[in-house]
Amino acid sequence: MSSIISNSLRILNSETFAKRIAEQPTYLFIGKDTSWADEELPDIPTESTKDLTQLYKNMLAVKRVTADTMTSVIQRINWTSNSVYDAFDDTLNMIDDRKSNGTRYRYYALTDEFNVYKCLSNNNGAASVNKPTSQQITEFKTPDGYIWKYMYTIRSTDVFSFLTQDWMPVYTIIANDGSSQWQVQENAIDGGIHDIVVKTNGASYNPAIPPTVVITGDGTGATAQADVHPISGAITRILITNPGVNYTTATVTLTNIGSGNGCTSVAIIAPVGGHGKDAKLELGGVNKMIKMTLNGAEGGAFPTTTFRQAGLLYKPLSTEQGSKITVASTNGFKAGETVTGDTTGATGVIRLVDDNERTLWIDTVVGAFIQSETISSDGVSAAIERVVNNTNLVLVSTVASADDVVTRTGEFMYISNREVIARNDTQTEEVRFIIGF
């Protein structure tokens, strides 16, 4: 038996991850102000109990991750003149498959205007010399014979935050933002045929009266025309004049061929939804980049020293105490509101709501909540299923020193050992992680 994890599931997992850490306190941590045995060769991180415990001991400070500090990314491929780009091929997984030489498929390109284009046809493997610039809804042909599809433009704020030498942001828009990308998504052609690849050119076709291209399949409307070499009579290219719609299978034949013979070709069908419908899925947005900025001492929480470890710590506990309450439903409860127990009269302020675990973290507690009583807040109520009073509360502050984090609480989600980074109170560091799914 063989199986794969689909890119759709990988993207779903990446979005679930991003949503979870945006809603529940997750922190960048930095640590280890002491030297590695070899400062140019940091230790390889492990998840042994001993090493995870040592991470807490090494920890210097933490800063909370927010939704605007992360985005989906794909490998950066720049458009450069005289480079060959791979044309989309519906028989390949161009995200994960590799060429015979082990390299990735280069089937999209980023221009210096921060536009991203998908290559639908590369003029039989020719070099691209004309930069694509159009943001039109449909695919377009450049003078060098390439056919490109505009996908999206990297947002100006993301250029500075998430565009690096190796990675670039990728988006699929879920609501009309007035952008060209939205128009491309809304007008994508499901099951369109945007390229026909000539496998064998044949010979002796009449250039004065080119053969008729017939596309047969389960869709409708696709048409194309053949280019014939003026001397050999070979079919040099078949150009799409109408991509049609709703094809899942298609064959290409030539009629009115005269004495011509030997040409074979294959229709390339667009992905589900059509080219440009889902840039994140089409280009392989299975990675998340998290970019955190550390500004000097961060108000005193961060020491201005060296560090050699960084990573993500999910829901650590703080040294502050209060109540952890599991309820039948957290629906309607909001952080910052006061809750009251209907039996005990105990009160407290909601610090954090965790819908997945049906948990309310309560600080500023007066009295003691008990199991089975009902708690109420601003017209919302729920029965307590379990309560732990006088317990350490989840950390929610924006920044905190290591002394504010309870050792061996929370979950390490990412660990990075690196060469020494020296800090000072006038310095800003940018720390980036790539999380793959």
Q: How does the language model describe each region?
A:
Residues D144-F437:
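Conserved, function-critical positions that sit in or immediately flank catalytic
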